[in-house]
Amino acid sequence: MEAPYSMTAHYDEFQEVKYESRCGTGGARGTSLPPGFPRSSGRSASGARSGLPRWNRREVCLLSGLVFAAGLCAILAAMLALKYLGPGAAGTGGACPEGCPERKAFARAARFLSANLDASIDPCQDFYSFACGGWLRRHAIPDDKLTYGTIAAIGEQNEERLRRLLARPTGGPGGAAQRKVRAFFRSCLDMREIERLGPRPMLEVIEDCGGWDLGGAADRPGAARWDLNRLLYKAQGVYSAAALFSLTVSLDDRNSSRYVIRIDQDGLTLPERTLYLAQDEGSEKVLAAYKVFMERLLRLLGADAVEQKAQEILQLEQRLANISVSEYDDLRRDVSSVYNKVTLGQLQKITPHLQWKWLLDQIFQEDFSEEEEVVLLATDYMQQVSQLIRSTPRRILHNYLVWRVVVVLSEHLSPPFREALHELAKEMEGNDKPQELARVCLGQANRHFGMALGALFVHEHFSAASKAKVQQLVEDIKYILGQRLEELDWMDAQTKAAARAKLQYMMVMVGYPDFLLKPEAVDKEYEFEVHEKTYLKNILNSIRFSIQLSVKKIRQEVDKSTWLLPPQALNAYYLPNKNQMVFPAGILQPTLYDPDFPQSLNYGGIGTIIGHELTHGYDDWGGQYDRSGNLLHWWTEASYSRFLHKAECIVRLYDNFTVYNQRVNGKHTLGENIADMGGLKLAYYAYQKWVREHGPEHPLHRLKYTHNQLFFIAFAQNWCIKRRSQSIYLQVLTDKHAPEHYRVLGSVSQFEEFGRAFHCPKDSPMNPVHKCSVW
């Protein structure tokens, strides 16, 4: 799944653009008098008089009036032709509809594109700076954000729409889920009540977990009854806090028609294991800030021996980091190499210090047999976790597990807790100002009531007509991939047949799931209590209900049409174990997509993102799954070897890019780079197909660029973005995407059609002689 490409971008007030007639004639030219009226013979004025018939005065006046009326009609006809014919109606086959919205959209598009450009930069030298230079000059990063870009601007508009929807009264028409999400939003905004409660709600949770230090001291009677498995049940099965490992219900990678319990490495608070190892100055700063954060939260919660507790918990997390494997390691990307299906009996032998049957029986409310199969994705890690449990004092294990619950819930507490979180985020990512409360609460509403909020969003901000148009655009791009597969000279016939089958079976979801149109169906997703005065309790109710829904899946039939994200999400994704692409309504907004924009911009905008997700089905990760979403090697050895050889060229290309003295990791970002490059090509060729079928588009007013050039400009302007320097460190370390500058340069420089469109000299930076290409 893609990380969020985190709703219309900051358009100015655009003036209307006046177009000439599509027919290329002036409004008065070719206008003839009505039948029966004689034409002028071209004689001089003096000679004309002698040729007039001798009409009486009344007839002369009548004729003059008719001539005046005819002239007025001609002028009106010219004005109407100027207004309703022209570039704005391109592709409509005639006059555009009343009001001509596409003409205004063309004007907006022209203003947006030209404002973002920096025409002083040679596009053949640095296309990103050419396409985004104007935008980068005009925009600063808001104080409460880590990054800001053209897609983030779309997010701002979507957020404003969602806030207005949530601000409406709780009563009135609509289902129970809609009333609950509004009540939840209000409970989050009620900072007076949250502040009045202070740490008390969290202290109740800690007490439920057994308190700190096994009830206060290691020699108390309660310590003798301490049970690691019971506390793991509380953490994982009640509060959804991953500790020591993660426990989820997922599709079985080798049999995607069934759900399976999946166990994997987890339990670290910081986002990447290398941050715990303090291998460079950046990670040392993060680790020091994390230690301060731990001590601050422990003091707020009234813990004793704060420094000692923090140090012991940190050391335990460092031990977990040392036995973990980075998510970007080759081992983790090869799913077949980590997939290990075992019975509960076998799992018990791998990790003898955990009581797996008891733990799973409690969480799932089942009576599992020893033969129940689970998927273990980190066998070596779990063996070492068992040894870590054996060698770690119970008090430290207990405090670590309680800490993991505290970390998960602390963002929902009173201002002192939120300030501590902000100070850590500031050191890690550089955001100077905490998010305003309304944005925080909107984020929580999205997280806990995503589909309920989505039902409100699509009802008012995404039409069925837009859904149909985007679906057609997706089909056009899929068609091009089918053609490209036939043309590949490095893939043999057997592998091509399997690749075509995968394309044919691929599911495409656009806009929103249909069940959102039925309030009673949405209500079933949120059958838990919500009260406006109990924010943290609302969170806990949501967590417990989500766990209930998840554990029920283990015996349910798989429905591959379900969505991972709600429709207002500013994201798009491909799921290999479903062979499913999803394009939510939240990302199908201007400037990425506008039904009235020139198609060059739609294909360069949302089209390249569609192509990106489509290509994920055939990259180094998605290519491990077959047409049904099963982990199955469908390549011949010869074709796969040639694929890896071509992929290595891309690895070397991105390894040569640096940002803030950090080298981009070409292997780490390989899948996304393949998808960027492939998506650009697929969308471009799909646009050429559209032009062949509908005819060329009229130029954008006052822009000297061809529509082929505008396609590439639109692609680049998807990724106009500014980042804080601290966040760049984490991006290069943890993000599977290359920095945006190089997402653009790496893609266009390897595509021969870009060099042709901009007439770039051979071996110029954007048109190297030797290019990397997979799809």
Curated annotation (Swiss-Prot):
One of its GO terms (molecular function) is metal ion binding. GO terms for biological process: intracellular signal transduction; neuropeptide signaling pathway; protein processing; respiratory system process. It is a single-pass type II membrane protein. The chain crosses the membrane at residues 62-82. Keywords: Disulfide bond, Glycoprotein, Hydrolase, Membrane, Metal-binding, Metalloprotease, Protease, Signal-anchor, Transmembrane, Transmembrane helix, Zinc. Glycans are attached at residues 255, 322, 656. Residues 23-51 are annotated as: Disordered. Disulfide bonds join 124-760, 132-720, 188-441, 649-772. Highly expressed in the CNS, in particular in neurons of the caudate putamen, diagonal band, the paraventricular nucleus of the thalamus, part of the hypothalamus, in cranial motor nuclei, inferior olive, and substantia gelatinosa of the spinal tract trigeminal nucleus. Not detected in cerebral cortex, hippocampus and cerebellum. The active site is at residues 613, 676. It is found in: Membrane. It holds the Pfam family Peptidase_M13. Zn(2+) binds at residues 612, 616, 672. Induction: By mechanical damage to nerve cells. Its cofactor is Zn(2+). It comes from the Eukaryota. InterPro entries: MetalloPept_cat_dom_sf, Peptidase_M13, Peptidase_M13_C, Peptidase_M13_dom_2, Peptidase_M13_N. Residues 32-51 have a biased composition (Low complexity). SUPFAM superfamilies: Metalloproteases ('zincins'), catalytic domain. Residues 99-775 form the Peptidase M13 domain. GO terms for cellular component: plasma membrane. Its EC number is 3.4.24.-. Belongs to the peptidase M13 family. May contribute to the degradation of peptide hormones and be involved in the inactivation of neuronal peptides. Cleaves the synthetic substrate Z-Gly-Gly-Leu-pNA and releases pNA. May protect against C2-ceramide-induced apoptosis. This is Endothelin-converting enzyme-like 1. It comes from Rattus norvegicus.
